């Protein structure tokens, strides 16, 4: 091969000018292209070998000069190591002396300790490719003879120059990128480093309590120190704040390295540079603008130091902070001066001169002064921008925010602000206002959440039951109940004997959980000691209970709560229901026909011990027959007027039939005008409530059914009035209802209804009636006797409103059902001389003048009523077609199609109708003896089973109540299982609890009416439209993504960079070109004695999501789950905007459950940040949402637990017998989400989300997926332990070879801290728009709670500047 003479200009070892680096580049390129002229040969491909050699030589000369010009090099010891290719990844030993303290108290001095610190080397390979065309290489060999040849030659030179420059620039950028990556790999986040470096923690060791402290400090530092540039912009003195932050950043890292005293970069005045801050262009400009430049250049080496290792054993050692140039020097050091005393400076002078002898040059960089330390500030973002590569200091970070919707704030005893004037001081909000990233106020209300709330998965208990059944039922067998879950048929038709036998044989009292909850406060229910009750509170729409199915076997059952009023009081208190009533009034423009004074008259009547007993007899004789009412108008008028004149109360107010007919037939002056006006008002109020409900529901049809029954239970045809005097059962014949009469069950009313004989034909039927009364065995006569009904739905609705709303509210539930023995009543009335001796006694004479002592006289005297003989005779005539006795019918119907999801047992709802029964109030003791032969109490409905009223009528019930203190309350009173089963009823204990404590006011009427609104999708839709609270609050969860610009600080001499020699290889890619691949090996060693680099997010470049109110659409996720009625599905889909004809005809969606998500045609504020809602009790503490907490309602970060003990970790998460570690006085703030098997758990936990479309994003999943939570907690646990091992105590004393690197998972912690902390940050939100306006005012303090509304400030790492209009939040 021909010898080539190459021109080479090595770097001089002498003083040079400041522009040396530029000269190196120019001289190298010039020499290279002159050498091209020496390439001769016949085959260009052969000559390319020489070009390869040539390229390698000159690449070696000019490579990595740009790196020395960067500020990043100031934090490194840069050394050329020609033998680097022979080195493999390994460990290098450094000997470090640990200083000690000489004590003055006589303690024995410590010996000098030296430790060998093991540092791991890391090798890196960078390469660049240079591709040259064959034609260009041929042109390089030609002798330019003409001008055209010269022009072509010059073009070739330019092409080769460009290719060479491209490759060399790539290598130079590669070195910078490699060093920056190495720095980042050794740079933990500031909030971790500061927390773990706290000496108060490291001195105490890493106990469980310390780890919990660390989590708290992580959160504090994360919120306080993140994005300090943004926070400084809102301050009056941003310079001081930024200097303080930079000082914290600089002081958080270790200044100690194995190269003690080494400083290769100084200012022009000789001050050593403390380190370098690497950041982005935007932050660099902001820092220089605020802080100013201290210096504009630094003095640094213009070349790499030479590093040579000789000898058989390749050992690199640093002793006493001085670098050993060779193994011989290291050996001499150990032999000649092992303790490093005399002459140590002379012996180390050689290593010092290694850096001092390098040529120096000035490098233009920006230097700021933080305290007394000069720090280089630079940005190399331009290099990445030019290469169109992502800048490592730009990161996408995700933060999860949460805010509450619909919380109820009890009326406070005081207020902290008076700036907002509201019409009512006890408002209830059904919306929440948030501010998106463009400072646009947005309203999130229940309409936004309908796509979740209306989904069948939310309205079904199946998933919750499945999880409960997986639990240990043996532990719950002792808590199981047999009574209260389902009714049992009566033995016969003798209602009196059935009730009497139940209370005589009752030896134990059953206090059902549904009743126990009613008598607890919110704090009591959520207390750990009540975890047995709390474990059954899993769902806002369902009651769960343990049923005993065998001697030692139990099973969990779920029944729908049906009405919003059936949510227990601790989770929906009475004051909250009153506020809902006001919303109902406002939405329906309800104008009450009565005033509170009128309702007080009803209440006074119910509690009046002198209520005329004769009124019960009159009511029994009429028993709901209009013709008998008209026959007995004189007697009725006498009772009304007498009682009104004596007490000012209203007679017959316990019967809607009587009230309605009084208003119809007695308006002509037959009774007192004032009394009649009150009757009319009462009836008018019932009509007004009916019209208000209709206005709320609207006039829409749901197929062939009216919509009202799906919204409010009072208009549901499945619910019958509690008292029947006519055939009201026929309307259910075609609705799948079943009727239990005695021990038999029928599916058609015609099978058990006997029509009452027509009163007009009494003469013809009287003998037959007399015969049946005296010959039938009425105990086994399983039929009821009522008059034919007219199926007037409107009249039935008014009757239900009166008995289910008006009477319970006005009487505070001081009522009971009452059965009658009609024959005994007729005997008491008729078997008296003035009554049946017509010739002797004039019909106009009052009976008390001629009446002998007996029950009737006692009754009339006690009632202060003195009727005429004709009045009593007409009353006796009414007995001709009276029924024989009072009966009950147990009505079982299927729930509406929105509430019948889940097990079949829960799809059945029951209630009892008393046939020819009445409502009774309490009676005085003196009347009990007389009354017991005619009437008897029947506790058949939760509103009509007051134990005190029942006990006043029956001694056996009275003894039962007196012997069992828990049975004195309406909601807990046990009733015979044949006529009432609490969990299967329409009206349950919470509604009974409300009526016992509410005021007799129009507000209570409205509240109790809206409490009959159903917990169903259609009801949610209607209430959301009218802004009526549905009965439960929501926790709204949203994850936002920000593009963060980070700041990295690296201390001086914290990394040793070794630059090897390049190798050039040829690789032919195609026939017309030759590629040369330049490979270069690098090595780095982290030299700090602790973490010497740190990174922290400093500035929000942009928020990529809209921070808006777009809510998750569960119908797209679980598209195969539907209701079992096409009209219901179509209505729900149409009203909430999920009607998609494609999905309905798509087999993939129906079979696999894969929905098709509809995407908007365009966006305005950025990518939608999907919100998900978690049902939450309205009594949840608003303070819980004012700081970072778990959206589950219970702390979920188990970093302080043992990761190897999964049982303990799960106990931390789900065991509510233990208090919430974050709030010791309660187990949870949201039992519907924090418990295993709760609605939130099954809705967002991946165990239950059998989704075939994995692309659906769920911000709630990380907080509910148990496996992911435990995995993140294990990672967090490992991360804390690993960092703590490196930072606890003096690191050099460790006998391990721990390296100061970023622990796996740190990037996730930095970019998604909410995953590890298991907490979400509160975002700016207010339950009323005006509170946002107040926040934007000049005030510095703002009331968090104001007149029933609440305001939550944003507490998050991202500090947003809120501006609405011209107002900026202070």
From Swiss-Prot:
Belongs to the herpesviridae major capsid protein family. This is Major capsid protein. Keywords: Capsid protein, Host nucleus, T=16 icosahedral capsid protein, Virion. Pfam families: Herpes_MCP. It comes from the Viruses. It is found in: Virion; Host nucleus. The keyword Endoplasmic reticulum does not apply. InterPro entries: Herpes_MCP, Herpes_MCP_upper_sf. Self-assembles to form an icosahedral capsid with a T=16 symmetry, about 200 nm in diameter, and consisting of 150 hexons and 12 pentons (total of 162 capsomers). Hexons form the edges and faces of the capsid and are each composed of six MCP molecules. In contrast, one penton is found at each of the 12 vertices. Eleven of the pentons are MCP pentamers, while the last vertex is occupied by the portal complex. Homomultimer. Makes the hexons and eleven out of twelve pentons. Interacts with triplex proteins 1/TRX1 and 2/TRX2; adjacent capsomers are linked together in groups of three by triplexes, heterotrimeric complexes composed of one molecule of TRX1 and two molecules of TRX2. Interacts with scaffold protein; this interaction allows efficient MCP transport to the host nucleus. Interacts with capsid vertex component 2/CVC2. Interacts with the small capsomere-interacting protein/SCP. GO terms for cellular component: host cell nucleus; T=16 icosahedral viral capsid. One of its GO terms (molecular function) is structural molecule activity.
